[in-house]
Amino acid sequence: MDRRAFLQTAAAAAVTASLPDSASAQYARAASTAATPNKKTIGIQVGAVSFVDEGTEKVLDNFQQYADVNTLFLATFTYGRGIAGRQIPGQPLPDHGQQQYDTGTFTGGNYATIHPQYYKNTVFHGTRATDLGSYDVLADVIPAARKRNIKTIVWFEDAFRSDIPNISALQEIDLSGNHADTVCFNNPNYRNFLLGIVEDWSRSYDIDGIMWCSERQGAFSNALGAEQEGRDINPLQVTCFCPFCIQKAKARGINPDRARQGFLALAAFVTNGRKGRRPVDGYYVELWRLMLRYPELLAWEMLWTDSLRETYAAIYHHVKQINPALGVGWHISSTNSFNPIYRAEQDLAALAPNSDFIKIVMYNNCAGERMAGYISSVSQTLYGDVPPQQLLDFHYRVLNYQEKPLAQIPFTGFSSDYVLRETQRSRAGLAGTNTLLWSGIDVDIPTEPTHSKCSPDGVRDAVLAAFQGNADGIILSRKYSEMKLTDLQGARTALQQLHLST
């Protein structure tokens, strides 16, 4: 059967007929038409620390018992806490694992063995994570998972620190001429590091695939503060203006000096907006004036976006040359749910030729808090003339979902209808391609203490909504070490209603 041939099951409809006419019942009835047993990916993101803290077999037991997991996304390389380490310090500890934070021990890095022969074309090899001693998460977990018919996908991100040996050779250069903490896609040392690390994993371990995450956006959106924590972005520190990017820009016919002038003017616009200094013709008109005066602004933005796409393609083809059977794909960040500019750059049809799968973040519980942060930021820059609630309504309209008012969403989160709409939109964006769509599901992603928290029912409804929208699978996110087993159980409840539970 084709992987997108969906089996309509009268049995699933019979199960849900006895449920109350609630959102979950409606989703289960509709999703039953998209539920093909043994064809859906039920994935979970998990870091190395969980296997060390709880024991490999116990963790795998929990995954199967509470969520019917059939695919592991092992966080193998990162210097960030978003996908590795224990619970974020200060957030409530989950109902499993070590009941203490790893504030003094977490280092990040590569949680697998580094084989130097694959890094000959770069000065940067990454560093072996030291917080768990010599523990190799791939060597330990893959054989145990194989015995249970659970697949293993290596999961990594481009989150770095400035104190890593040789990292300066990879770093982006910001508008002010300083090294940034981020690294440049056009830098051969970084590109070759990425190719080296995926070759290392592909040749050294019995993996099923690789998923890479870059939760960054280009200089234009960053300068405008067009993301959930955008108010913290200094517009004079946007990237990248390194020699490699300048050379690439010139090859495209973009004048780097004009681009710098444009971004300096944009930085002044943003700084004045944050100080309440309204332009004579208003914020939106003034922004358009800058874009018309400096078309290099958008040209530089697209240079960055194309460089990311080229990195995707390079990773994809390098892995396929080594082992065509390995799946390769990408994680698209939550900014996709808030910033229309960023969404425009996430052209799924353009990404599909170099993607076996794409995970789209649909983190509904934390989305309310994050959307509120985004609105707070852009209401001081490009949309400074629009009252915040009207601005939110505008975004609901152009992004095609309807959630609660601005004053409420940090405390309610987004509904499962948002997950449904985003899955349907992404499915349509991938129409006619062979790329699998995996919906990223929020399970206890940290929020502020008084803001919305996940629940078993909320997780259940999000999973049901994803399958109603014809997702090829789900990925329970962000990391197991912050998830409550009681909330994870909500995923299994949904899968049972869909007859996808083993």
Put a short name on every predicted segment.
Residues 5-26:
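N-terminal export signals
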Residues 20-43:
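C-terminal segment of N-terminal export signals and the immediately downstream linker at the start
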Residues 35-54, 444:
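Boundary/entry segment of secreted carbohydrate-active catalytic domains
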Residues 50-66, 106-143, 307-311, 414-422:
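Aromatic- and glycine-enriched glycan-recognition loops and surfaces
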Residues 58-80, 204-207, 469-473:
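Catalytic domains of carbohydrate-active enzymes, especially glycoside hydrolases
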Residues 62, 120, 124-125, 129, ...:
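Polysaccharide-binding and catalytic clefts of secreted carbohydrate-active enzymes
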Residues 69-130:
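Aromatic-lined carbohydrate-binding/catalytic grooves of carbohydrate-active enzymes
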Residues 355-369, 412-425, 432-493:
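Substrate-binding cleft of secreted/luminal carbohydrate-active enzymes
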